[in-house]
Amino acid sequence: MDIKIEQQQQQQQVELGPCSPSEVPNDPGKMFIGGLSWQTSPESLRDYFGRYGDISEAMVMKDPTTRRSRGFGFVTFSDPNSVDKVLTQGTHELDGKKVDPKVAFPRRAHPKMVTRTKKIFVGGLSAPTTLEDVKSYFEQFGPIEDAMLMFDKQTNRHRGFGFVTFQSEDVVDKVCEIHFHEINNKMVECKKAQPKEVMLPANLAKTRAAGRSAYDNIMWGLGTLPEGFPAAAYAAYAAGRGYSGYPSFGLPYPTVDLTNGQLTPNNNTPLLTQALSVMNNYQAAAAAAHSYGPSASPHAAAANTATRQGFPSTNSPGPTIDMYSSAAADNVGYVQATSPQPSGFPIAVSRAPLNYSPIYSLNFAMANI
């Protein structure tokens, strides 16, 4: 089933490529051959289907980079009746693989933008603006044949845009040269109206781009953790054990703030609020599981300090340095932070200067009692 869908997509997308209407002749003798083996060549394709009639052209579509077959091709018969012979045969097998021949339909050319028209699009209208306001404004440029505002069926209010049809195309050119017009103290945009066939692909592209933008905003809004840094470590800092000079959780993400150890959204998007609630619960659980966060009492802090392990053993012949010793001369002017990982990891030393604020000094003193 998936192979048939893929073949249909290949036929629709690559059949004749982007061509102008003059380059898209409807050749009744041309067939699309899908499901080809990677070993099938134009010669073998011609040899197999040549039994049904004289072939004027046979080709296998290849990747422009790798030059490998893309698994489909085309056969053009001199006599269109040969196509019926191929289709009535039923199953076809070429180079040990079942192939799927179909009638090749030319791809419809993309409609071009309209450059001469009597109708204009008017967008950005204010809510109080009426149809009479629009007519009275544009009548100064020339006679109007028709005007309309697009209304919402549920609210029965116009949707902020409409169309105006003039009697002359020259008037449209004059109006669109100005581009922006002021109606009821609001600037509105005027453009030449385009057929639906032209606007549909453009609107589809905008919708896809908006979807990607919304997805990106959601992903960044959730506070995706940087690669290579454990989530449990950030849980510790979110619980209140941040250090001066160390990156704070949430700073790179403009849609969330870190307040009292909790991630709070800058907007009330339901999906973002729900996701942050899940993340806060996860961070709290991770912090509790790894004994992160501020100690409940000075005695508990002292107990944690007593069981704290230093650097892992080393094979270096040099002396072992106690980074926690107050007598160590190398620790002056630097903040010493234990790694939030279990004791198998070394100590992370930040080279940022000490922050001598009273709050920081109190927290640092409490943590080292």
UniProtKB/Swiss-Prot annotation:
The keyword Cell membrane does not apply. InterPro entries: MSI_RRM2, Nucleotide-bd_a/b_plait_sf, RBD_domain_sf, RRM_dom. GO terms for molecular function: mRNA binding; poly(U) RNA binding; single-stranded RNA binding. SUPFAM superfamilies: RNA-binding domain, RBD (SSF54928). One of its GO terms (cellular component) is cytoplasm. RNA binding protein that regulates the expression of target mRNAs at the translation level. May play a role in the proliferation and maintenance of stem cells in the central nervous system. This is RNA-binding protein Musashi homolog Rbp6. The gene is Rbp6.
